[in-house]
Amino acid sequence: LNKMINVALPKGRLGKKVYDMFELAGYECPSIKEDNRKLIFENEEKGIRYFWVKPSDVTIYVERGAADIGIAGKDIILEYEPDVYELLDMQIGKCRMSVAALKGTREITDRTLRVATKFPNITRDFYNRESRDIDIINLHGSIELAPVVGLSDVIVDIVETGKTLKENQLEVIDTVAQISARLIANKASFRFKTREIENIKNALELEISTELEANRR
């Protein structure tokens, strides 16, 4: 008998893309496409139950076992370092975690660098590797504003197209990490539901390589 697998999907644009991949991989759940406010959807026949959660909460659901597997951005995984298995790069939601500064800013070497970010741990790790003294300014939004109004010297943030940076006269001066969506698993679930989770992973992997092949043509 197949055991039911609980999947935490990130709400929003990325989550819809992720669900489409699960569907193409053979784990469809038609009710998820209906326009309703429900958060939990299941397909008993396929042994799968999906729920929508805030993207930054996916790792919490998976780490604590409320979900067996989930899809989380590498940025969230690096920032919170959850105790989970990372099984697969989903090859979507690709972007870069970058350092940006006002255009034409000279490099600051004679004092502590002020860095505004939503990702204090990633930022600290990055500058520790560079043995650089920094003062982290932990913001929750509109990070690009910080250097413009003199709150910080640089920012560490996610850059997709770079359009927002350009509009605010900022430029990327360094890359911290390459980010994309990852399939993660709860460690105990992986032990007790190995076959089911491996089946999902393999089906997704096949789906991803088919997609990549199609894009190459």
How would you name each of these model-derived features?
Residues 1-217:
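Domain-level signature for soluble enzymes in the chorismate/prephenate branch of the shikimate pathway
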